[in-house]
């Protein structure tokens, strides 16, 4: 099968060719020169950086300049200097001679196929290792495996000790969450299959003890890597450490596993957000991942923070930047491991499993819809006719489980990528999503709403800024002022600042549109038996967005705000009062504006008097008046 490598003009260099760089790169401008000179003067560990960069000479994406620098005894590699100075070559790094960008064969399930192994049967007797198991997606993955693959042997969770809490206590807290309620009642013994592994994704060897490493290497045959920092404004150093180095360290562990059948890496559809059309391929990286890792090891963090905007280029944040490089790290380091990458778009509340509307965080649209429900969010920069590519978390998890099954059973080292998105097969635009959300938060209001939920999407920045001041911050300062007078603690301004920060992170994705191709997802769907399609649902064409958004609102009402359905009647009465107050406020605002204009313009006053006089005359012509 031929390699469907995207952007041929960027990647048609021979696989073993090197990135072209100037022998003596110069800073792009005087400001960068000062930063770089200051760095070289203040940093003592540059010799180590040179050895790291030089050791990669001749490997995938390595720099010929780095190799020549080794003999000169220079303090750092030419590649690292180029990156720091912001003058790295525009020539894209070649992709390694791997099966990047393959399209999955389109094979339909046949009822007479005796070789077909059901997904649950595939997981029977197997042990699974999960990173990020205490996160939003990880929790749903653990619950789904326990519920739908009852003969699974063990699930090992990488858990970090946190705030003095041991991993066993954190696991107990996890399994006592509402998400596992049905399992606790119906299959309590299944929970004993979950085994904590103490570790830290930011540490060498993942912070796992030698004993636990040996345990994993002997027993694990499927690995799900979902650990990541999803903070869009994360520092580059920490983002690289978690998203890139964490991936590299996990792959090193996987190479030691005696019976590994599948490694599923969770990326993001937006790792290639610098292009409009995104296929199920790995695109040429902006930099050699090893150079970026070398850079964070020797560059002072304050200088690194200043250079971050130049490094990430057209990408909006460190999250998408490091996720893109992590895919290349995986492609380079995996070798002959059976690997697949799942790229979800914006992950939101569950569609059906384990119950509709489950969500445990305020990230992304959840936080904004929650603020809308509270009456604290009324305007946003957004292209209302663009696709809001959101995907329910259980859809992503079912795809991950099926992708691991397919990776293991097809017995091929070719890396496949699955874009898990809704925009191509069942799109919803932002205006429709907001309309459904507005209807739902009014129908199922939160307790303690501050105002009647309403708002608009805009693409006029000055108008949006004026509305933010008038509708967000001005009322917030007034309410906090009243709170201080009454001797209460002010909080509204602080909440509005958090909302503004969340909006700023989401704005990039709400004002742009992408076309994510999902042919591999569609092909995988058709290889499943009808029964497996019912158990592991990831066909996004069946999502009813109106019903989904309503369940979404009911879900965060119950699971985030801890408000029971019994409180809805009282909340609806309060919502009705807020509606009348909202209408009265608008009427008063119109009258005050009109009164102000009348007092400032004699001509307008005369026109108004003339209008009233003519209206009165016409009224007298009506017989019954």
Swiss-Prot record:
Location relative to the cell: Peroxisome membrane
Membrane topology, Cytoplasmic segments: 1-577
The keyword Cell membrane appears for this protein: no
GO BP: ether lipid biosynthetic process; long-chain fatty-acyl-CoA metabolic process; wax biosynthetic process
Protein name, entry field: Putative fatty acyl-CoA reductase CG5065
Catalytic activity reported: a long-chain fatty acyl-CoA + 2 NADPH + 2 H(+) = a long-chain primary fatty alcohol + 2 NADP(+) + CoA
Biased composition (Polar residues): 14-29
């Amino acid at each position: 099968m031929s390699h469907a490598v995207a952007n041929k003009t960027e990647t048609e260099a021979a696989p073993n060719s090197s990135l072209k760089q100037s022998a003596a790169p110069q800073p792009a401008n005087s400001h960068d020169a000062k930063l770089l000179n200051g760095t070289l003067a203040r940093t003592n560990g540059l010799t180590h950086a040179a050895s790291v960069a030089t050791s990669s000479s001749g490997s995938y994406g390595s720099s010929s300049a780095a190799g020549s620098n080794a003999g000169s005894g220079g303090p750092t590699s030419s590649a690292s200097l180029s990156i720091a100075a912001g003058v790295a070559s525009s020539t894209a790094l070649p992709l390694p001679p791997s099966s990047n960008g393959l399209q999955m064969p389109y094979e339909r399930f046949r009822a007479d196929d005796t070789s077909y192994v059901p997904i649950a049967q595939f997981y029977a007797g197997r042990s699974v290792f999960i990173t990020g198991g205490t996160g939003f997606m990880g929790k749903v993955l653990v619950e789904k495996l326990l519920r739908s693959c009852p003969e699974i042997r063990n699930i090992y969770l990488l858990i970090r000790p946190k705030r003095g809490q041991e991993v066993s206590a954190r696991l107990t807290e996890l399994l006592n969450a509402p998400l596992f309620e049905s399992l606790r009642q119906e299959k309590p013994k299944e929970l004993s299959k979950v085994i904590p592994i103490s570790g830290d994704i930011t540490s060498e060897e993942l912070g796992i003890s030698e004993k636990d490493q040996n345990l994993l290497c002997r027993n694990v045959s499927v690995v799900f890597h979902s650990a990541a920092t999803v903070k869009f404004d994360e520092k580059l150093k920490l983002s690289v450490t978690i998203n890139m180095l964490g991936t590299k360290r996990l792959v090193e562990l996987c190479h030691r596993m005696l019976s590994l059948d599948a490694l599923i890496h969770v990326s993001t559809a937006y790792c290639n957000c610098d292009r409009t059309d995104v296929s199920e391929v790995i695109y040429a990286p902006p930099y050699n991942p090893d150079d970026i890792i070398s850079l964070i090891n020797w560059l002072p963090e304050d200088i690194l923070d200043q250079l971050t905007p130049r490094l990430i280029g057209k990408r909006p944040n460190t999250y998408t930047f490091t996720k893109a490089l992590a895919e290349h790290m995986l492609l380079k380091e995996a070798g002959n491991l059976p690997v697949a990458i799942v790229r979800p778009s914006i992950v939101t509340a569950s569609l059906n499993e384990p119950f509709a509307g489950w969500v445990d965080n305020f990230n992304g649209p959840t936080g904004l819809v929650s603020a809308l429900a509270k009456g604290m969010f009324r305007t946003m920069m957004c292209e209302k006719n663009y696709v809001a590519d959101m995907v329910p978390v259980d859809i992503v998890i079912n795809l991950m489980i099926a992708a691991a099954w397919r990776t293991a059973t097809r017995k091929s080292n070719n890396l496949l990528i699955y874009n898990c998105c809704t925009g191509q097969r069942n799109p919803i635009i932002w205006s429709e999503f907001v309309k459904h959300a507005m209807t739902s938060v009014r129908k199922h209001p939160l307790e303690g709403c501050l105002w009647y939920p309403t708002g608009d999407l805009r693409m006029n920045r000055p108008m949006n800024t004026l509305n933010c001041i008038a509708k967000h911050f001005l009322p917030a300062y007034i309410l906090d002022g009243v709170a201080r007078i009454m001797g209460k603690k002010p909080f509204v301004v602080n909440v509005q600042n958090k909302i503004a920060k969340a909006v700023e992170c989401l704005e990039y994705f709400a004002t742009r549109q992408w076309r994510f191709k999902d042919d591999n997802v569609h092909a995988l769907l058709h290889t499943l038996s009808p029964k497996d399609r019912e158990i592991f649902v990831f066909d996004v064409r069946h999502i009813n967005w109106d019903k989904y958004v309503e369940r979404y609102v009911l879900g965060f009402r119950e699971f985030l705000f801890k408000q029971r359905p019994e409180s809805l009647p009282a909340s609806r009465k309060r919502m009705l009062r807020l509606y009348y107050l909202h209408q009265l406020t608008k009427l008063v605002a119109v009258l005050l504006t009109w009164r102000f204009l009348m007092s400032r313009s004699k001509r307008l006053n005369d026109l108004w008097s003339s209008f009233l006089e003519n209206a009165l005359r016409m009224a007298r012509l009506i017989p019954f008046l």
